Amino acid sequence: MAKRDYYEVLGISKDASKDEIKKAYRKLSKKYHPDINKEEGADEKFKEISEAYEVLSDDNKRASYDQFGHDGPQGFGGQGFNGSDFGGFSGFGGGGFEDIFSSFFGGGRQRDPNAPQKGDDLQYTMTLTFEEAVFGTTKEISIRKDVTCETCHGDGAKPGTSKKTCSYCNGAGHVAVEQNTILGRVRTEQVCPKCNGSGQEFEEACPTCHGKGTENKTVKLEVKVPEGVDNEQQIRLAGEGSPGVNGGPAGDLYVVFRVKPSETFKRDGDDIYYKLNVSFPQAALGDEIKIPTLNNEVMLTIPAGTQTGKQFRLKEKGIKNVHGYGYGDLYVDIKVVTPTKLTDRQKELMKEFAQLNGEEINDQPSNFKDRAKRFFKGE
């Protein structure tokens, strides 16, 4: 399903000011927030609104979106890597129309092989504990990636040697090829397979990188994890991808987070949930109970007559929003626990309570014979 235009999502014009964008976002996010709107589809609508605001409220992202739309140059939406298990890191990219045209006609239009090209982007999967994701942290990672060859400094030739005119294409950087196609015999030009379009070849290739200009090494990087990141979210480390070609910029490294669940809380976005068991006397008479929060412990007042399923909301006791939109809430869900083992004295008190409440409790199990006698006696 195609994404809707971000301006359409927020109901604003393409020349809307920042204040108009913010005003539209606040109005719509309040209307479709999952805690307020329980209608089907409200959650997805809220995510769509948040995604649109994240892009349009940022000058650089907005300018890029206005120029390229949803599909470029890096795409938008924060969650760009689905839920797949990446298992470490890998390069990613893809060909455009020119590549398809080239493969079909045996050449066709060719990009300038000597033009600067950005290096490949990489992805790395980082596992975080619940606490690391909530409070942020700094972690050192080790990845294997292509880096500029230290021996030849990316030139590809052995130091002290020079390059010469390519013997295959005579320095043209491309060669003529004739192929049979559905349109008949077609003569096209292709990038020279020997010099890759440079028009030159080495007298002697670099002994370290064998002419590639890059070598694969293990690199250590320090990654600053922001507060409030959630599972499947990612951050971009600009320039930490593969080296560029022909003087082009390096690609980027995308760090995708896998967050382990908490043993204490259940997370839903920026909100967290805590299950609190209370005894029958506490629920009936009321009490003050100490409960955990993300930073410390607080006293929660349980009113008399509290029932199972009652939920208490502690505002802004949740997780800090990763984009800086305040804090989520802490929800405490109550479960009244029925005692399973009672002393004789406790049983007497419970029976007395039942009698005062007008209830008759028969806690003596009867066998089939006794039940049959009472049945025929009309009891």
From Swiss-Prot:
**GO MF annotation: an example:** unfolded protein binding
For this UniProt record, give its keywords in alphabetical order, as a comma-separated list.
Chaperone, Cytoplasm, DNA replication, Metal-binding, Repeat, Stress response, Zinc, Zinc-finger
Q: Note the segments forming the CXXCXGXG motif repeats.
A: 149-156, 166-173, 192-199, 206-213
Binding locations of Zn(2+) 2 = 166, 169, 192, 195
Span of the signal peptide? none
Instruction: Name the Gene Ontology biological process terms.
Output: chaperone cofactor-dependent protein refolding; DNA replication; protein refolding; response to heat
Q: Does the keyword Ribosomal protein apply?
A: no
The places in or outside the cell where this protein is found are: Cytoplasm
ZnF (CR-type) ranges: 136-218
Under HAMAP family, the record lists:
DnaJ (MF_01152)
Similarity comment: Belongs to the DnaJ family.
Notes on the domains: The J domain is necessary and sufficient to stimulate DnaK ATPase activity. Zinc center 1 plays an important role in the autonomous, DnaK-independent chaperone activity of DnaJ. Zinc center 2 is essential for interaction with DnaK and for DnaJ activity.
The record describes the protein's role as:
Participates actively in the response to hyperosmotic and heat shock by preventing the aggregation of stress-denatured proteins and by disaggregating proteins, also in an autonomous, DnaK-independent fashion. Unfolded proteins bind initially to DnaJ; upon interaction with the DnaJ-bound protein, DnaK hydrolyzes its bound ATP, resulting in the formation of a stable complex. GrpE releases ADP from DnaK; ATP binding to DnaK triggers the release of the substrate protein, thus completing the reaction cycle.
Q: What is this protein called?
A: Chaperone protein DnaJ
Which organism encodes this protein? Staphylococcus aureus (strain MRSA252)
Tell me what gene encodes this.
dnaJ
